């Protein structure tokens, strides 16, 4: 009887299908340029303060979450999910939305102009996206 119970218990435990669903949505950089990508629900781009790692920020889980880049010739540490190198994927940019906006700035532009000037002159690309634009949580 004990063997039968263990058999049924092991079948019920090991036969469970675990469905891992992706959390978040990604964007793929299919260009030769390094890009800064931001996805949000607002129809205006942020001031850039979310992209840059501040050493006093305590939410960083490891230094692997950041990458160095340049803004106006100065070394700047970005969160990896905003800084997307050529032919690679961003980190999870956004989790749950019906409609969102994807903002993209080329790092070449970010290294020549201030964030304020980029925003004022609209030197970025903006796309309006819905969940239908993502295939397997990824936008290309």
PLM regions and their residue ranges:
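Sec-dependent N-terminal signal peptides
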Residues: 4-14
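Short solvent-exposed strand-capping/beta-turn motif centered on an Asx-Ser/Thr pair
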Residues: 30-32
């Amino acid at each position: 009887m004990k063997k039968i119970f263990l058999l049924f218990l092991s079948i019920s435990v090991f036969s469970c299908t675990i469905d891992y669903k992706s959390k978040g949505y990604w964007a793929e950089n299919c260009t030769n340029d390094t890009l800064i990508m931001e996805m949000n629900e607002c129809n205006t781009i942020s001031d850039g303060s979310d992209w840059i790692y501040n050493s006093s920020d305590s939410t960083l889980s490891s230094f692997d979450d950041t990458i160095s880049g340049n803004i106006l010739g100065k070394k700047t540490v970005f969160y990896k999910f905003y800084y997307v190198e050529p032919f690679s994927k961003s980190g999870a940019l956004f989790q749950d939305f019906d409609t969102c906006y994807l903002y993209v700035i080329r790092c070449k532009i970010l290294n020549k102009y201030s964030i304020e000037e980029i925003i004022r002159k609209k030197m970025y690309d903006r796309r309006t996206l819905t969940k239908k634009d993502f295939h397997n949580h990824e936008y290309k």
